[in-house]
Protein backbone atom coordinates (compact mmCIF):
# COMPACT_ATOMS: atom_id res chain seq x y z
CA UNK A 1 0.00 0.00 0.00
CA UNK A 2 2.83 2.38 0.89
CA UNK A 3 4.57 1.69 -2.42
CA UNK A 4 1.31 2.39 -4.32
CA UNK A 5 0.92 5.78 -2.60
CA UNK A 6 4.57 6.63 -3.29
CA UNK A 7 4.25 5.73 -7.00
CA UNK A 8 0.94 7.59 -7.28
CA UNK A 9 2.48 10.67 -5.70
CA UNK A 10 5.45 10.43 -8.08
CA UNK A 11 3.15 10.25 -11.10
CA UNK A 12 1.19 13.24 -9.81
CA UNK A 13 4.40 15.28 -9.47
CA UNK A 14 5.44 14.36 -13.03
CA UNK A 15 2.01 15.26 -14.40
CA UNK A 16 1.95 18.61 -12.62
CA UNK A 17 5.47 19.46 -13.76
CA UNK A 18 4.56 18.72 -17.39
CA UNK A 19 1.37 20.74 -17.36
CA UNK A 20 1.98 24.32 -18.37
CA UNK A 21 4.75 23.51 -20.84
CA UNK A 22 4.38 22.70 -24.52
CA UNK A 23 0.82 21.54 -23.91
CA UNK A 24 -0.21 25.21 -23.74
CA UNK A 25 0.87 25.81 -27.35
CA UNK A 26 -1.08 24.72 -30.43
CA UNK A 27 0.39 22.07 -32.75
CA UNK A 28 3.34 23.39 -34.83
CA UNK A 29 4.15 26.01 -32.17
CA UNK A 30 7.09 25.77 -29.75
CA UNK A 31 6.95 26.73 -26.09
CA UNK A 32 9.49 28.77 -24.13
CA UNK A 33 9.04 30.57 -20.80
CA UNK A 34 5.27 30.97 -21.10
CA UNK A 35 5.19 32.02 -24.76
CA UNK A 36 4.53 30.12 -27.98
CA UNK A 37 6.62 30.62 -31.14
CA UNK A 38 6.26 29.59 -34.75
CA UNK A 39 8.62 30.06 -37.68
CA UNK A 40 6.93 30.85 -40.99
CA UNK A 41 8.74 29.87 -44.17
CA UNK A 42 7.19 32.56 -46.32
CA UNK A 43 8.48 36.05 -46.88
CA UNK A 44 6.47 39.18 -46.20
CA UNK A 45 7.19 42.83 -45.56
CA UNK A 46 7.19 43.89 -41.89
CA UNK A 47 3.66 45.29 -41.82
CA UNK A 48 2.10 42.25 -43.50
CA UNK A 49 4.05 39.86 -41.27
CA UNK A 50 2.91 41.70 -38.12
CA UNK A 51 -0.70 41.65 -39.33
CA UNK A 52 -0.38 37.94 -40.18
CA UNK A 53 0.90 37.20 -36.66
CA UNK A 54 -2.00 39.07 -35.04
CA UNK A 55 -4.39 36.88 -37.05
CA UNK A 56 -2.75 33.59 -36.04
CA UNK A 57 -3.54 33.70 -32.31
CA UNK A 58 -5.12 36.13 -29.87
CA UNK A 59 -2.32 38.37 -28.62
CA UNK A 60 0.00 37.31 -31.43
CA UNK A 61 2.77 39.58 -32.76
CA UNK A 62 6.13 39.36 -34.44
CA UNK A 63 8.69 37.95 -32.00
CA UNK A 64 10.11 40.21 -29.30
CA UNK A 65 13.19 39.38 -27.23
CA UNK A 66 13.32 39.95 -23.48
CA UNK A 67 16.61 38.12 -22.85
CA UNK A 68 19.60 36.59 -24.60
CA UNK A 69 18.26 33.15 -23.63
CA UNK A 70 15.01 33.85 -25.45
CA UNK A 71 16.93 35.10 -28.49
CA UNK A 72 19.05 31.92 -28.43
CA UNK A 73 15.87 29.83 -28.27
CA UNK A 74 14.50 31.57 -31.38
CA UNK A 75 17.84 31.02 -33.17
CA UNK A 76 17.51 27.31 -32.30
CA UNK A 77 14.13 27.32 -34.07
CA UNK A 78 15.04 29.39 -37.12
CA UNK A 79 18.55 28.26 -37.99
CA UNK A 80 17.76 24.62 -38.92
CA UNK A 81 14.77 25.67 -41.05
CA UNK A 82 15.86 28.91 -42.68
CA UNK A 83 19.63 28.39 -42.64
CA UNK A 84 21.49 31.70 -42.97
CA UNK A 85 18.69 34.25 -43.41
CA UNK A 86 17.03 37.14 -41.66
CA UNK A 87 13.70 37.07 -39.83
CA UNK A 88 11.56 40.03 -38.90
CA UNK A 89 11.36 40.91 -35.24
CA UNK A 90 8.60 43.03 -33.75
CA UNK A 91 11.08 45.85 -33.17
CA UNK A 92 10.50 48.93 -35.29
CA UNK A 93 10.26 52.67 -35.53
CA UNK A 94 7.38 52.59 -38.01
CA UNK A 95 6.04 55.90 -36.66
CA UNK A 96 9.44 57.50 -37.44
CA UNK A 97 9.70 59.05 -33.99
CA UNK A 98 13.33 57.97 -33.44
CA UNK A 99 12.04 55.54 -30.82
CA UNK A 100 12.21 51.80 -31.45
CA UNK A 101 9.40 49.78 -29.84
CA UNK A 102 8.26 46.17 -29.79
CA UNK A 103 4.98 45.59 -31.63
CA UNK A 104 3.57 43.73 -28.61
CA UNK A 105 4.14 46.77 -26.38
CA UNK A 106 6.74 45.09 -24.17
CA UNK A 107 9.70 47.05 -22.80
CA UNK A 108 12.86 47.36 -24.84
CA UNK A 109 15.03 46.07 -22.00
CA UNK A 110 17.07 43.57 -24.02
CA UNK A 111 18.93 45.08 -26.97
CA UNK A 112 21.62 42.47 -27.68
CA UNK A 113 24.18 45.26 -27.14
CA UNK A 114 22.82 46.82 -30.30
CA UNK A 115 23.58 50.49 -30.81
CA UNK A 116 20.58 51.97 -32.59
CA UNK A 117 21.58 54.38 -35.33
CA UNK A 118 18.51 56.08 -36.66
CA UNK A 119 18.32 56.14 -40.41
CA UNK A 120 15.83 56.04 -43.22
CA UNK A 121 15.12 52.40 -42.33
CA UNK A 122 12.68 51.60 -39.57
CA UNK A 123 12.40 47.84 -38.99
CA UNK A 124 14.70 45.35 -37.26
CA UNK A 125 15.49 41.88 -38.56
CA UNK A 126 17.52 39.23 -36.76
CA UNK A 127 20.08 36.90 -38.36
CA UNK A 128 18.98 33.27 -38.02
CA UNK A 129 22.51 31.99 -37.37
CA UNK A 130 23.64 34.34 -34.61
CA UNK A 131 20.83 36.79 -33.74
CA UNK A 132 22.73 39.82 -35.03
CA UNK A 133 20.26 42.63 -35.58
CA UNK A 134 20.00 44.85 -38.66
CA UNK A 135 17.81 47.87 -39.33
CA UNK A 136 16.44 47.41 -42.82
CA UNK A 137 13.59 48.81 -44.94
CA UNK A 138 10.19 47.63 -43.68
CA UNK A 139 9.20 46.97 -47.30
CA UNK A 140 11.83 44.24 -47.71
CA UNK A 141 10.50 40.69 -47.86
CA UNK A 142 11.83 38.51 -45.02
CA UNK A 143 10.87 35.35 -43.16
CA UNK A 144 9.35 35.87 -39.72
CA UNK A 145 8.55 34.35 -36.33
CA UNK A 146 5.24 34.91 -34.53
CA UNK A 147 4.88 34.83 -30.75
CA UNK A 148 2.02 34.92 -28.27
CA UNK A 149 1.67 34.47 -24.51
CA UNK A 150 0.48 30.97 -23.61
Swiss-Prot record:
Main location: secreted
GO cellular component: extracellular region
Pfam families to which the protein is assigned, alphabetical: Lectin_C (PF00059)
Localization: Secreted
Coiled coil stretches, renumbered: none
Transmembrane segments: none
A GO term for molecular function: toxin activity
Entry keyword annotation includes Ligase: no
Database matches in SMART domains: CLECT (SM00034)
S-S bonds: 25-36, 53-146, 123-138
Residue intervals of the C-type lectin domain: 32-147
InterPro entries in UniProt: C-type_lectin-like, C-type_lectin-like/link_sf, C-type_lectin/snaclec_domain, CTDL_fold
Tissue expr: Expressed by the venom gland.
UniProt signal peptide: 1-23
Keywords: Blood coagulation cascade inhibiting toxin, Disulfide bond, Hemostasis impairing toxin, Platelet aggregation inhibiting toxin, Secreted, Signal, Toxin
Family statement drawn from the similarity comment of this UniProt entry: Belongs to the snaclec family.
Subunit structure: Heterodimer of subunits alpha and beta; disulfide-linked.
Function: This potent antithrombotic agent acts in a calcium-independent manner. Exerts its anticoagulant effect by two distinct mechanisms. It binds to activated thrombin through exosite 1, blocking fibrinogen clotting, platelet activation, factor V activation and other effects, and it interacts with prothrombin (F2), decreasing its proteolytic activation -especially in the presence of factor Va. In vivo, intravenous injection before thrombosis induction causes a significant decrease in thrombus weight.
The protein's name in its UniProt record: Snaclec bothrojaracin subunit beta
Amino acid sequence: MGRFIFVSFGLLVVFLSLSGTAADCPPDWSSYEGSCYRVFEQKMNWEDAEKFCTQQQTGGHLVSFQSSEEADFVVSLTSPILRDSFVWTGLSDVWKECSFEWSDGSDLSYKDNYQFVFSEYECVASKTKNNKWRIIPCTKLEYFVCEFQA
